[in-house]
Amino acid sequence: MRLTKAFQPTLKEVPAEAQIASHRLMLRAGLVRQTASGIYAWLPAGLRVLRNIEQIIREEQDAIGAQEVLMPTLQSAELWRRSGRYDAYGPEMLRIQDRHGRDLLYGPTNEEMITDIFGSSVKSYKELPKALYHIQWKFRDEVRPRFGVMRGREFLMKDAYSFDASYEGAVASYRRMMLSYLRIFQRLGVRAVPMVADTGPIGGDLSHEFLVLAPTGESAVFFDAALEEQDWLSRPVDCDDAESLATFFATVTDHYAATDEKHDEAEWAKVPAERKREGRGIEVGHIFYFGTKYTASMGIEVSGPDGAPFHPHMGSYGVGVSRLVGAIIEASHDDAGIIWPASVAPYRAAILNLRQDDEACDAICDRIYGTDPENLLYDDRSERAGVKFNDADLMGHPWQIIVGPRGAKEGKVELKQRATGERFELSVEDALAKIGAA
């Protein structure tokens, strides 16, 4: 994308309403614009980040056999009355009526709808297990929306649901999903620590939340450093083998990790001092096992091996996709702007032409840009070099390819790595190879 053609409305001034770094930087960098209290429009660069996160989630969910569906944002109130949650959920649920006076709601979650869909289609234990997921916008009417997309009223979420014939099968599904989540977060460039959690209004008796470490996190966290040091991407786990999943799960649960709500000083004292880690965390994911809570309350049955009907066991698994954008920025920024992990950055690199209309500079920039115009941002504006440097740092592109007249004459460019500030003088070919665009 050429910056002269891009819709990239950056702000020079810090918005007064923005209280935390991610909110300030998302507004300043032109990723989002607020349209109402707690509701944001996603602009092109921000949408590219969302799509990159979605793609990683899809790849990892598909890898464990989950299948993608897409459910509507509006749900029938009758489904929620069947589960008993319509009146219990509280004022966070946005309730509406259509022109015929039928009660609807803007879904804050999808347990009821997916259970109804499953129950209308699956009739035998032979069709189990099943895992379904979707990525959809949701709405919760927060009393005090704040911190930008971190606590908005409308948000993009990936939620998945598993259905199993037994408790043992459901626990295997739960562990499989935990591994998928840990792989997702590592690929996104953040370290999310899994911690035992309350089940809240979802219900159930087994739950973990995943928290990204950041100074502005809502929760105090206490955990064993071993959890932060794990390489989940290289861990060999057979997701179809219950014993392999149990071994993996033990590597998580054998190490202490808790938020302030669940913190146990006696257990914390058992962690060696050199492995103790304390800080604050932002919740970006939550997984639940709740047995037959919804299948029983909604009358969903399948036939077992002996022909007798039974209620399948369920799990529910959520990732805050739009919240992750804010969490990644909170965990990875500096005074100059965002520092995107390469896997989610809106563009692989920014090409900074320091001398517009210089024949050598233009030729090199055009050559580099032509290798991958979809994933390179070419700053071809007639602006001062300082403006281009500042905007590139603000936007947080992993690499900056700086093309000036002196280097251009020698066929050289300067390559700057945003995360470290390191600079390299390289040939065009070597620069492209280093950023992975060759």
Swiss-Prot record:
Q: So which domain of life are we looking at?
A: Bacteria
Q: Look at the named UniProt entry and state the broad enzyme category this protein falls under.
A: ligase
Tell me its EC number(s), please: 6.1.1.15
Q: Which UniProt keywords apply?
A: Aminoacyl-tRNA synthetase, ATP-binding, Cytoplasm, Ligase, Nucleotide-binding, Protein biosynthesis
Q: What is its main location?
A: cytoplasm
Which CDD domains does the protein's record reference? ProRS_anticodon_short, ProRS_core_prok
Q: Which Pfam families match?
A: HGTP_anticodon (PF03129), tRNA-synt_2b (PF00587)
Q: Where in or outside the cell is it found?
A: Cytoplasm
GO molecular function terms listed in the Swiss-Prot or TrEMBL record = ATP binding; proline-tRNA ligase activity
State the reactions this protein catalyses.
tRNA(Pro) + L-proline + ATP = L-prolyl-tRNA(Pro) + AMP + diphosphate
Q: Give the record's GO CC terms.
A: cytosol
Q: Name one GO biological process term.
A: prolyl-tRNA aminoacylation
Function, as annotated: Catalyzes the attachment of proline to tRNA(Pro) in a two-step reaction: proline is first activated by ATP to form Pro-AMP and then transferred to the acceptor end of tRNA(Pro).
- Assembly behavior: Homodimer.
Q: Which family does it belong to?
A: Belongs to the class-II aminoacyl-tRNA synthetase family. ProS type 2 subfamily.
Please state what the protein is called: Proline--tRNA ligase
Q: What's the source species for this entry? A: Gluconobacter oxydans (strain 621H) (Gluconobacter suboxydans)
